[in-house]
Amino acid sequence: KVPNKIGFHTGPGGNPTGIGDFMKKLDGARIPFCLKSVDHYGPIFEAQELMKKSNVPHVLVFRISTRGANDGYDYDVPPYKDPKYVNDPEGGAEKHWRKTMAKLPPEFDRKRVWLEPINEVDKDLCDWLGRFAVRTANLAQKEGIKVTLFAWSSGEPEPSGWETPGMLKYLRLCAKRPHQAAVALHEYSYLENDIFDQFPFKIGRFQYLFQICDKHNIPRPRVHITEWGWTLNTVPPPEKAIPDIRNVGELYARFPEIEGAAIWYLGPAF
């Protein structure tokens, strides 16, 4: 029997009413929960403080966004389109890491919280991104920080993307340092009325990653589904949503490598 892996994705504004109660109740019952937040550190801070006292292994992920930072730098994606870094993913990683570290909240708990440094990146640049991820994970390790990458859009990348030399190198690093380097994925159905549409092409796509790892004799990485749900702007009514959540939760429960999955979204207009 495994605990429910489904948690929530939150951010600035929005509708996090009740999230504190949700966290306290589960923590009190010693049940791990999953929480992802972008830009707004408050909910993660609350969760990490609970964790310090209880030692329940909650899954906490934080990301800094371009929109949230609003300083002219693109925090969402690496500088892979910058001519200076087109052939230098390691240099791109160093720049991106410097920028990210400068924005990291002082309360960030390096022991308990995963940092997600990029989001919905270019599926055609897998080898570049794999090399970028290796350097990022090594820079993070020096700072005592845990990272989870790449937060691919639902339906991406192509399975062959995982087999590029850079990606395989990152997957081997994850296998070597599972407590410090992990893989982040997004899984949406893009439909409100059929959560398993085209399964496992969208929801369930993590299985392609595992197949590639198995093929190359690489232990499967720790996985965070840092966004999942129906569509970007809508969720179905509770009588439809709850069974969908249960069914997707049962799918993820079968794979011990999946640590948590954050429902999109406790944000504005939801």
Spans of features found by a protein language model:
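A structural motif corresponding to the C-terminal end of an alpha-helix
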Residues: K103-R112, T136-I145, L173-H179, L209-P221, ...
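Aromatic- and acid-rich polysaccharide-binding/catalytic face
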Residues: S37-V38, H58-Y85, K111-V113, N119, ...
